[in-house]
Regions:
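Small-residue-rich hydrophobic transmembrane alpha-helices
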Residues: 51-111, 148-167, 275-339, 371-393
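Short runs within selected transmembrane alpha-helices of multi-pass transporters and secretion channels
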Residues: 72, 140-159, 167-178, 196-211, ...
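Short alpha-helical transmembrane segments in multi-pass integral membrane proteins
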Residues: 1-21, 79-146, 188-243, 301-367, ...
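Transmembrane helical elements of multi-pass membrane transporters/channels
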Residues: 19-38, 140, 174, 203-207, ...
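Interfacial/gating helices of multi-pass transporter permease domains
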Residues: 42-62, 129-133, 193-194, 235-242, ...
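N-terminal transmembrane alpha-helices
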Residues: 8-46, 59-74, 78, 103-110, ...
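Helix-terminus/linker motif at the lipid-water interface of multi-pass membrane proteins
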Residues: 33-52, 121-128, 184-191, 251-281, ...
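Transmembrane alpha-helix boundary and packing residues in multipass membrane permease domains
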Residues: 24, 28, 40, 44, ...
Length: 451
């Protein structure tokens, strides 16, 4: 029984729910790990200038590729609801439409990105050797942008298709490809930043193109198949609105990172910026657990909402909040234990920087206790098709509250205010999330089953 295939229509116990979301959590963790390896290879084999250039230009393809996240989360919710309503053919048509829409729109953005790459890099502060590295790395990533968007989309749709394990193994394949090619192209063959970019491109072909062949095959055993489709303008618009929280999150991250770096340069100079970089790399691993759970459980919520199974919605809602609470405590405690070791791996060569990073990470890590509830809340409302509420939580959490905290807390607390800003933002966002959970129940009936 324990090995029986789990379906979206099932009743979910704690065990069944965890088994269903674990592949998605693993996918997010593995993606974070091979991203870290990518950065370490450039830093150690090419140098700090190349590493700085990669980090400088990386937000641009991340921003342009956000359409994949947006249509992946927003589209999978619509497809999941449609499956719950029992319309398999329409679900396949919507699935195909979302993939084609992402492919076309991101391809256009990739061309524009290549054309305007140099002026954007200069605007971000690149010049001289830094600009040269940024251009060489950025051009290749712009070419790979469509595959990057598809890879992001499939992370959500594999779960909706009841194939989270297959999605995990595609990610493992892409990650291993990236790491092996990084070592070969950057470390052994000496191809520099171009080698790192090519390794990323090839890995995205594994994660973004190979799944297309799987879903084209009509004999595959998943819930979804690619097929001939039509242009459903309203459905596409709804998917964009529904997934707008993902767009907001990625846009906000870039703006917030700029302000973080500005404040840290004021209070701690280059060491402050370096410490923040280490914290971001390490935080990816902890955030991945919360995001993995939220993304992995969202299609279940969409399906049962589409099926009007409010009893199961209540079951999923209550169990998820309890699990998030346990995970939050474990993640916060674990981060406190591993902080010295993680900091030493990145900056063990500098005692002053090591001490600053270790202290800053301990203060920053307090936000892990709150973050999970906000991440889940935003994803939960996306799964219910309420993109406006989801986007509101994301906007307040990742942009407005963080910007306000980063501006005002350092005025009172100095650099400690910078490290505490994210926790203050999560606390403010949690108040909004709880309020939305209470008020929106009148519409979606996930806390109380209607008579």
């Amino acid at each position: 029984m324990s090995k029986q295939r789990i379906q979206l229509s099932d009743h979910f116990t704690y065990s069944r729910l965890l088994r269903f979301v674990l592949p998605c959590i693993g996918t997010m963790l593995f993606t974070s790990i091979y991203g870290i390896v990518d950065g370490l290879c450039v830093s150690n084999f090419v140098g700090k200038t190349a590493f700085a250039a990669v980090n400088l230009i990386m937000p641009l393809p991340m921003l342009l590729g956000t359409i994949g996240f947006m249509l992946g989360t927003g589209g999978s919710a619509i497809v999941g609801i449609t499956l719950g309503e029992g319309d398999q053919k329409k679900a396949d048509c919507y699935f195909t439409l979302f993939l084609l829409a992402a492919l076309v729109s991101v391809s256009v953005l990739a061309v524009l990105g290549i054309v305007f790459l140099r002026p954007i890099a200069v605007l971000l502060g690149a010049k001289g050797e830094l600009l040269d590295y940024a251009m060489r790395y950025g051009r290749i990533l712009m070419v790979s942008l469509p595959t990057f968007a598809l890879q992001n989309m499939f992370q959500s749709f594999f779960v909706t298709a009841e194939k989270p394990h297959l999605g995990f193994w595609f990610t493992v394949g892409a990650g291993c490809t990236n790491m092996v090619l990084d070592v070969l192209m950057v470390g052994i063959w000496g191809w520099g930043v171009e080698g790192a970019a090519i390794a990323t491109f090839i890995s995205q072909l594994v994660g973004g193109v190979l799944p297309v062949f799987y879903f084209i095959d009509r004999s595959n055993s998943s819930r979804l198949h690619l097929c001939k489709t039509s242009f459903y303008s309203k459905v596409l618009r709804d998917a964009c609105i529904n997934g707008s929280s993902e767009l907001m999150t990625n846009l906000s991250m870039s703006l917030v990172n700029i302000l973080y770096n500005y404040q840290l340069l004021r209070f701690a100079g280059e060491n402050g910026v370096a410490a923040y970089g280490v914290i971001m790399y390490a935080a990816f691993l902890f955030v991945a657990v919360f995001v993995g759970y939220a993304v992995g459980s969202a299609p279940i919520v969409s399906y049962h909402y589409g099926a009007r199974n409010h009893a199961e919605l209540n079951n999923l809602y209550s169990k998820s909040l309890r699990l998030i609470g346990v995970i939050a405590v474990v993640m916060t405690a674990l981060s406190m234990l591993v902080i010295p070791y993680v900091a030493r791996i990145f900056v063990g060569y500098d005692a002053e920087l090591l001490a600053l990073t270790s202290h800053a990470f301990r203060v920053y890590a307090l936000n892990f206790f709150l973050m999970g509830f906000n991440v889940y809340g935003s994803s939960f409302f996306t799964a219910l098709g309420d993109g406006v509420t989801s986007a509101l939580i994301s906007f307040l959490r990742t942009l407005l509250f963080q910007l306000l905290a980063l501006i005002f807390l350092p005025m009172v607390l100095g650099i400690e205010g910078v490290w505490l800003a994210v926790t203050a933002a999560e606390a403010g966002a949690l108040c909004v999330t709880v309020l939305m959970f209470i008020t929106k129940d009148k519409v979606f009936h996930y806390r109380k089953v209607p008579c």
